[in-house]
Regions:
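Short active-site neighborhood of thiol/selenol oxidoreductases, capturing the structured segment around
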Residues: 54-82
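Structural microenvironment flanking redox-active thiols in thiol-disulfide oxidoreductases
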Residues: 79-141
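Short loop/turn microsegments at loop-to-beta-strand junctions
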Residues: 39-40, 62, 160-162
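Bacterial Sec-dependent signal peptides at the C-terminal "C-region" and cleavage site
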Residues: 11-27
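Structural micro-motif
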Residues: 128, 139, 143-152, 156-164
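N-terminal "domain-start" segment that seeds a small globular fold
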Residues: 23-55, 80
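Sec-dependent N-terminal signal peptides
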Residues: 2-13
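Thiol-/selenol-based redox modules, centered on thioredoxin-like
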Residues: 152-197
Length: 197
């Protein structure tokens, strides 16, 4: 009986001394995201007709995705979702976080067309860059980011969706396949990278 009582006292004391164990619930306590690879560099033309390079955004967390304005299937899902995340990021967006949407249809997506597209989805333009460029450069860049794109016989473009999050040092840290990923997880991953130095 004394042995059992002593054992209970030891266990209770150990539990009390160890304190409550907290389960991580936010981005500040989650495991660091893996380092996938250096992000492919680019210099393209923005919706304002100005050159923008990935290197210009060094020091920010950058989400890079590929879209085109005439897409009527999946791009209209991805861009509004990113707009929602833009709003949820609040004051971090633009100062510490940037979005880059690169057209895979540069023949039709001129800077003026991209500007209208950005306005249609409520993009916060100082922090969200819609980019176009020469066809071979865009196609090579898409391939290096892991995005497949090909023009179909009817002139439409079939393409895969892969959104990459690049850290402040230009390293891809996470990639989302498709367009139906959780916007809150996307936001948390961005916040996690913001907390890194």
């Amino acid at each position: 009986m004394r042995t059992a009582l002593a054992l209970v006292v030891v266990v209770v004391t150990a539990l009390m001394l160890s304190g409550p164990r907290e389960i991580p619930s936010d981005a500040s306590q989650q495991e660091p995201l893996p380092k996938i690879a250096p992000a492919p560099q680019f210099t393209l033309t923005s919706q304002d007709g100005k050159p923008i390079a990935l290197a210009d955004l060094r020091g920010k967390v950058v989400a890079v995705t590929f879209i085109f304005t005439l897409c009527n299937a999946t791009c209209p899902v991805l861009t509004p979702m990113m707009s929602l995340v833009q709003d949820r990021l609040g004051r971090d967006f633009g100062t510490d976080v940037a979005f880059v949407s690169i057209t895979i249809d540069p023949e039709r997506d001129t800077p003026e067309t991209l500007k209208l597209y950005a306005q249609m989805y409520g993009a916060d333009v100082p922090g969200w860059h819609f980019l176009t460029g020469e066809v071979p450069i865009i196609h090579d860049l898409a391939r290096r980011y892991g995005v497949f794109a090909a023009k179909s016989a009817d002139g439409d473009i079939d393409h895969s969706f892969l959104t990459s999050i690049v850290d402040r040092h230009g390293i891809i840290r996470v990639q989302y396949l498709g367009v139906r990923f959780d916007p809150e997880e996307f936001r948390r991953d961005i916040l996690s990278l913001l907390r890194e130095r």
